[in-house]
Design a protein with these regions (language model features):
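Core segments of small alpha/beta cavity-forming domains
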Residues: 1-60, 126-180, 184-188, 193-198
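Short C-terminal domain-edge/linker segments immediately following a structured domain
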Residues: 67, 96, 107-114, 130-133, ...
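Short, solvent-exposed aromatic-acidic interface loops
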Residues: 112-128
Length: 199
């Protein structure tokens, strides 16, 4: 079964298109846009995105590494990106998980609800597979290299994470199951651990 579900890079244009829009809307603070690509968006998420958008210039060099999801038309996506902070020269490489599925209207959307036990187990298992572990390690190494090359990067990231964590501390315990929740909250290596622990 695992051989039939190997990690594929940029294999589905429709997934790449959805993920690109998701990150474009997020960096722009466009909550209406996000609502068009997510199955739901909470008030807390809207507030977090609006508060952090001034620190974020954009997400660059996005690449989607996919495994098939639990159902036809669904995908577990490990998104590699380089997060460009405003006024910081060096982008921060990161890796975030998203779960994408086809809704009743036939459109691909980003799952943003409460994950089932089955989905949690599936994501956790996938995150420990060799191909994903190698991808996580590669992204973590790139992030460490970027941080070592630009001391301002780590400082700006701390500010960004504080904004995200301040607005999500109260909901962390209830939302830790949803794999995509990390995407906008945790750039760089923070995701490496959360892919493992959270879903």
């Amino acid at each position: 079964l695992e051989e039939a579900n190997q990690l594929e890079q940029d294999a589905y244009p429709e997934v790449n298109d959805l993920v690109q829009k998701y990150y474009d809307y997020m960096s722009a603070g466009d909550v209406d846009g996000l609502a068009s690509v997510e199955d739901q968006i909470s008030e807390e998420e809207q507030n977090r995105i609006l508060r952090s958008k001034d620190l974020v210039e954009g997400y660059q060099n996005i690449s989607c590494y996919t495994k098939k999801g639990l159902e036809d038309g669904s995908y577990l996506v490990f998104v590699y990106y380089e997060l460009k902070f405003a006024q910081i020269d060096t982008p921060a490489p990161g890796l975030s998980p998203l779960y994408v599925y086809t809704n009743d209207e036939g459109n691909l959307v980003v799952f943003n609800g409460e994950a089932s036990d089955e989905l949690n187990a599936y994501v956790e298992k996938a995150a420990q597979e060799d191909d994903v572990m190698a991808l996580r390690e590669e992204a973590k190494t790139k992030y460490e290299e970027a941080k070592a090359a630009d001391e301002n990067l780590a400082k700006q990231e701390e500010r960004y994470l504080k904004i995200a964590q301040d607005s999500t501390a109260a909901e962390e315990n209830t939302e830790e199951a949803a794999p995509e929740e990390n995407a906008e909250e945790q750039p760089a290596e923070e995701n490496q651990e959360e892919v493992q622990e959270e879903p």
